[in-house]
Amino acid sequence: MTPALSAEEIRDVNTRYHDVAADHYDAKWGIDFGDLGQSQVTAKVRKALGRNDGPFARSLEIGSGTGYFTLNLMRAGLVEKAMCTDISPGMLSTLSANAQRLGLDVETLATDAESLPFEDESFDLVIGHAILHHIPDLGRAFREFERVLRPGGTVLFAGEPSRYGDRIANVPKRVATAAAPIWRRAIKARPASPADGGAPEASLEGLVDVHAFSPGELSSFAREADLEDVKVIGEELLANWFGWTNRTLEATAHPEDVPWGWRNYAYKGYLALQKVDRTLLESRLPPAIFYNLIITASKP
């Protein structure tokens, strides 16, 4: 059994992994800064906040990565000024390049979420996407979020893995792994080699995710930090199963051998099932069953 990493080791692994991944991260995860990305991000925010969705004068993003959340919110006019932080300088470098290409002005700072170098009550909005599950001490981090938030301000974190939803997602992953040789023969693809996309950080990928959450556990971090109006909702069920099936299959093949027709099918199918999840399932099923959780809270 691999011994548990210390908090400092988790931070170090996350820094190294994301520094190496930064150059091809957007391509790997299909991150978009056009109309599609903007509509996806604004849909998450409006789903979580309802009519109280801004615009926000000054936002702080934790674990900004390459800018998916903040840059799309700025393009949509929901955020006016933004500070983007990440433990990875490499990610922030890619974010800055993306912002320059989009004509957006953002501040960036490499820092740890558990010890933010900002004055009290500095921001109207504290946000993040797929970041909380990387942070060793979430209690300390949420106390920092509360400290730097102005009274009446909002906390919003999306894309956090649900413990039960993550277990369910292992089923399509296992099925896809078993079916991969047949799938590769059908599309005439060679098996992937160790040199295919992402090899430099592959050895660290299994170490960077340190949490999966139940809705109650995620809520407790916000409440213990004296935040109010705490709400957790779930998103993506069918779309997630479909997406993980396709990602698992594609990871077994040479990238250049995966035909455009397949990628188009996977892309359009994912969007279609996102719509099914959003319109039919998310309001009817408990949050814990979904793959992703969104948490919102406010500072009194």
Pin down the residues of each PLM region:
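A short SAM/SAH-binding and catalytic strip from SAM-dependent methyltransferases
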Residues: 125-136
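Acceptor-substrate binding/catalytic loop of class I
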Residues: 201-217
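A C-terminal cap/extension of S-adenosyl-L-methionine-dependent methyltransferases
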Residues: 216-220, 230-300
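Class I SAM-dependent methyltransferase SAM/SAH-binding core
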Residues: 60-115
